[in-house]
């Protein structure tokens, strides 16, 4: 039987361990760091979490995170409103923005098709994307999903769904490792993938 700490400290460790990318040892280190940290530092963390939960929402247009909807990207008249880059998560928007190469809009799907996790097309923000295509302003959709099985399945689904529309559908060029995440790609690799995109 595994040993556990008493009460509050174990609940804190378990809470951190439930977060993505944090294992039991990392959760324990964070919990004990906070236990020994000055009260002001611990309170800053609590305040930051509360502020995010209170103020941050998803953009009604693209699904990106924002404090006011529509987000700053969707409401920027200097952006190219004729191009939409489709990504899985808000963190992917930031990865592409860091390249300073892309000036269009985004659509955050909120994930990718994954039958093993019971995630189908209706669980994603695909309807939100389709609603944006009715006015004829959008001329190109860039599919920038992670190069893994789920990303490929979603790309195939989107390309078939969008085929009847008079919209160019492209995807990022190779250069991103298969099974990798956009989040971890460097700016140069992403810039080259954007520049070399090809039709689906």
UniProtKB/Swiss-Prot annotation:
SUPFAM superfamilies: Recombination protein RecR
Occurrences of domain Toprim (ranges): 82-177
Residue ranges covered by zinc fingers (C4-type): 59-74
GO biological process entries: DNA recombination; DNA repair
Domain of life: Bacteria
Keywords in alphabetical order: DNA damage, DNA recombination, DNA repair, Metal-binding, Zinc, Zinc-finger
GO molecular function: DNA binding; zinc ion binding
InterPro entries, sorted: DNA_Rcmb_RecR, Rcmb_RecR, Rcmb_RecR_Znf, TOPRIM_dom, TOPRIM_RecR
Function description: May play a role in DNA repair. It seems to be involved in an RecBC-independent recombinational process of DNA repair. It may act with RecF and RecO.
Protein family according to the UniProt entry: Belongs to the RecR family.
Protein name as it appears in the record: Recombination protein RecR
Name of encoding gene: recR
């Amino acid at each position: 039987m595994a040993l556990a700490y008493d009460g509050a400290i174990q609940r804190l460790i378990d809470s951190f361990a439930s977060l993505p990318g944090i294992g039991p040892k990392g959760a324990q280190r964070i919990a004990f760091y906070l236990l020994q940290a000055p009260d002001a530092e611990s309170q800053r963390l609590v305040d930051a979490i509360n502020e995010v939960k209170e103020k941050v929402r998803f953009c009604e247009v693209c699904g990106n995170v924002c404090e006011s909807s529509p987000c700053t990207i969707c409401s920027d008249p200097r952006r190219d409103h004729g191009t939409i880059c489709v990504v899985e998560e808000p963190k992917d928007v930031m990865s592409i923005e860091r390249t300073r190469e892309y000036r269009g809009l985004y659509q955050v799907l909120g994930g990718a098709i994954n039958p093993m996790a019971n995630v189908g097309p209706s669980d994603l923000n695909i309807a939100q994307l389709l609603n944006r295509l009715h006015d004829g302003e959008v001329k190109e959709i860039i599919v920038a999903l992670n190069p893994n099985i789920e990303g490929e399945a979603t790309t195939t689904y989107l390309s078939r769904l969008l085929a009847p529309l008079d919209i160019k559908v492209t995807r990022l060029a190779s250069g991103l490792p298969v099974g990798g995440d956009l989040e971890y790609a460097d700016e140069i690799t992403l810039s080259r993938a954007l520049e070399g995109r090809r039709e689906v």
